[in-house]
A protein has these predicted regions:
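A ligand-binding cleft/hinge motif common to bilobed small-molecule-binding domains
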Residues: 91-95, 217-238
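Extracellular/periplasmic bilobal clamshell ligand-binding domains
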Residues: 302-336
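Sec/Tat signal peptide C-region and signal peptidase I cleavage site
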Residues: 22-28
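Bacterial N-terminal signal peptides
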Residues: 10-22
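Mature extracytoplasmic/periplasmic domains
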Residues: 255-314
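Extracytoplasmic ligand-binding site segments that recognize negatively charged/polar headgroups
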Residues: 38-42, 64, 68, 80-216, ...
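Early extracytoplasmic/lumenal segment of secretory-pathway proteins
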Residues: 28-94, 336
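N-terminal secretory signal peptides that target proteins for export/translocation
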Residues: 1-6
């Protein structure tokens, strides 16, 4: 009898100890987001790190090209591990939006951005903007001798004097803008002329360095590459020329982001998107790359030409669609 009582007391004490040692409710696993980053690596890494420091939410960054990651999302469908996709340009997100793979952006996030730089249906947002420019070497050409329109670069007189990057998403966006403004025939003539008389480069920084080193007089690039090279080297020999009067040479394009409809953590994914659009997030991004913040009322502190002074064509990122027509046209003329 005494043995049974002792055993009973021992079991009671043991069970009580286990109960006290076990939490009443199991703590939920910490949320970890996956970002598919088609933007430049240092940009995606910087904003992910800043968001994690602010919120404690870890962001796993997977780097790839914008088009590659968009195609991966299509292939993965509902099984995609990605929560947010961040692209260097808008056409890949227009493509995903057309296929119904993007979630609606929270209204509060849309409200802090100009409506011209978000999807018409609110499924993606522009994060930062950049402008197409001509980088030129004053030792090889005077600025006054540059063409009034980017369309003139298809003329034989520019043979060997203009460089471009046909595989660049921004170049393809510029080709779409030409289709929208001048028509398909004009765009084909422009691309054909560039192929015949221009110099092609593998990427924008290689092209810019060719101008800087005096290998070619001019190249068509985004403005921020010049500022990146300036940060790396200091004083540059090359300069930037901005087209005016709404010429397609001064097209404004945007890096963009969206939450995937298949996200397993939609609340936290929307929180990350909101951070990217916030003043704090925009500051992190624009300190890493010389692009224009799109948060209403913000200005760049990188010495860029004021955004309000850019004379861009009336072609919005939404107007550019998925850029398939430009890719098809490039293939037709032998550029891609």
């Amino acid at each position: 009898m005494m043995f049974r009582n002792t055993l009973r007391r021992g079991l009671t004490i043991t069970l009580l100890g286990l109960a006290l040692a076990t939490p009443l409710t199991q703590a939920a696993d910490p949320v970890s987001l996956t970002l598919y980053n088609g933007q430049h690596k240092e940009v995606g890494d910087a904003v992910a790190k800043a968001f994690e420091a602010k919120t404690g939410i870890h962001v796993n960054v997977r780097k790839g090209s914008s088009n590659q990651l968009a195609s991966q999302v299509v292939e993965e469908g509902d099984r995609s591990p990605a929560d947010v996709i961040y692209t260097e340009e808008s056409p890949p997100l227009n493509k995903l939006g057309e296929q119904g793979l993007l979630a609606q952006t929270d209204a509060a996030t849309l409200a802090v951005l100009p409506k011209d730089y978000v999807a018409g249906n609110g499924t993606w947002i522009g994060i930062t903007a950049r402008v197409r420019v001509v980088a030129f070497n004053p030792k090889l050409i005077d600025e006054k001798d540059l063409p009034k329109s980017v369309m003139e670069f298809s003329d034989p007189k520019w043979q060997g004097k203009v460089g471009f990057v046909p595989t660049s998403g921004a170049f393809q966006e510029q080709a779409v803008a030409i289709i929208k403004v001048h028509g398909m025939d004009a765009a084909e003539e422009w691309l054909t002329g560039l192929r015949a008389f221009g110099k092609t480069y593998s990427n924008n920084m290689v092209a810019l360095k060719a101008v800087e080193n005096g290998e070619v007089a001019t190249v068509l690039v985004n403005n921020y590459y010049w500022f990146a090279l300036q940060r790396e080297k200091g004083q540059l020999d090359s300069k930037l020329h901005y087209f005016t009067g709404g010429d397609v040479g001064g097209l404004i394009t945007v890096s963009s982001a969206a939450v995937l409809k298949s996200s397993k953590h939609p609340k936290e994914a929307q929180q990350f998107l909101a951070y990217m659009a916030s003043e704090e997030g925009q500051r992190v991004i624009t300190q890493t790359t010389a692009e224009y913040p799109l948060h209403k009322g913000m200005e760049s502190d990188r010495g860029l030409k004021p955004f309000s002074e850019l004379e861009a064509p009336k072609v919005t990122p939404a107007d550019l669609g998925n850029a398939e027509e430009a890719l098809d046209l490039e293939r037709d003329v032998g550029l891609n």
